[in-house]
Amino acid sequence: MHRRFLISRFFIVCIGFVLSEIQIVAAESFPQVRFTPLPSDILPSNEVRKLYQDSDGYIWIPTYNGLARYDGYGAITYGMRDVSNGLFNTFVNVVAEDHDKNLWIGTEHGLFRLDKVSGNIVADEYPELADCNIAVILCDTGNGIWIGGDKGLFRKNALDRNFHPVPISNSAGRPVKAVTSIIKDDKLNLWIAAFDQGLLRYDIREDRAYACDDAVLRKAHVLARDVAGNIWVGTWGAGVVRLVNPLAPGPTRYVHYKHVPGRTHSLLDDIIYDIEENPEQNTIWIGGRSGLSILHDIDNPDSFQNFFPGDNVGDLPYNEVNSILRTRDGLMWI
């Protein structure tokens, strides 16, 4: 029951998405932001999932009809014909590159690996991840790989052949499934968001998980870490949270940003899909159900610049902003 709900939610989020390049022009108060749509006919589908830039500068665009690689001029599509063994599930959620330049592909039904030189996709046989709806892949600095999905958290060290489950429990002591987001801090902790189960910290050295028992944090959905080390938590219905000294003992402290009806510069919507920092502008970009919010002052919850969809050239094309990516050349993509 829970797995079917997770898949349905992913599908609704991505309907009608357009990939956009964003150009910023100075203005008197907030900067003017213009959205330049990428031609949709170069993609296998407009149902775009989580964007990713690899070490060679290519932008990878997972869709619900295969995977596209964009080089700034055009796109190459990878689908079922590129699989060397087995059947490639073209409902692609996420990709990530390891230190050997393998591109790992997470789909609604398992894990695949792309050889970037040959273009072949290998259907790796990982029985523990068979039919797993993979939501997040984190390639670690030691060339280990972490996988999160509707079957929980998995890990593969650099020398391992297989992935191994990492048992973690929420604040009620129940096993955590439906992992939706993972980030790593500089203290060897993983921060984990699990749908309807909350925020957890997993100490890699101790092999131990700590659950954040808080009504707002129990709605954690997506995580991000800025250049200053701040951890941001986007929730499913409770806005955005910035953790304050998260490793301190006692209850988890945070700054809460949420939508306030009638306040123009509060957060646009409390259902959050993605968070990305633009360090050059010192802003936090937040994608959600109703559009895009840009936070200009982290100490002021009323400093959001909000964007709704419009019909004019340069307007946001659609309301739901599922993925935000800052590329190494400083451009923002949604």
Give each language-model segment a name.
Residues 1-334:
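Carboxylate-rich, polar loop motifs that coordinate divalent cations or form catalytic acidic clusters
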